[in-house]
């Protein structure tokens, strides 16, 4: 049995936003509320990064069009006593997925701790 740090990626749609910063604030706030409601206050929330195709620098993973944004969010948590890295991902997806019912989740990284 091992302990793992699992990072998942989620996409969140934020409506009626003015700009990128507003979209990020709304997404983090709403996901935080959902996680806290599910007693998952131990899950870390961060904005995902993507690489700018022009300059190669990392930028926030946000697209705003017509006051609607899609925001890439990273959710990370520690999973204890998992049988394997794959088992740790399943545990994390199950725990977080219960709170974020209609938000798709994808595993990004699993590190043994």
UniProtKB/Swiss-Prot annotation:
Q: Which InterPro entries match?
A: UPF0212 (IPR007564)
The family note in this entry says: Belongs to the UPF0212 family.
Q: Which PANTHER family match?
A: UPF0212 PROTEIN MJ0068, UPF0212 PROTEIN TK1194
Q: Which HAMAP family does this chain map to?
A: UPF0212
Its protein name is UPF0212 protein MMP1509
Task: Report the source organism.
Answer: Methanococcus maripaludis (strain DSM 14266 / JCM 13030 / NBRC 101832 / S2 / LL)
Which lineage is the organism of this entry classified under, starting from the top rank?
Archaea, Methanobacteriati, Methanobacteriota, Methanomada group, Methanococci
């Amino acid at each position: 049995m091992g302990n793992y740090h699992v990072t998942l990626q989620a996409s969140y749609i934020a409506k009626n936003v003015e700009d990128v910063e507003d979209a990020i604030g709304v997404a983090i706030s709403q996901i935080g509320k959902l996680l806290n409601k599910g007693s998952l206050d131990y899950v870390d929330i961060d904005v995902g990064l993507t690489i700018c195709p022009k300059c190669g620098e990392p930028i926030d993973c946000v697209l705003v069009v017509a006051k609607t944004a899609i925001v890439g969010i990273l959710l990370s948590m520690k999973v204890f006593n998992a049988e394997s890295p794959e088992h740790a991902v399943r545990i994390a997806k199950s725990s977080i997925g219960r709170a974020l019912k209609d938000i798709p989740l994808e595993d990004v990284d699993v590190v043994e701790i």
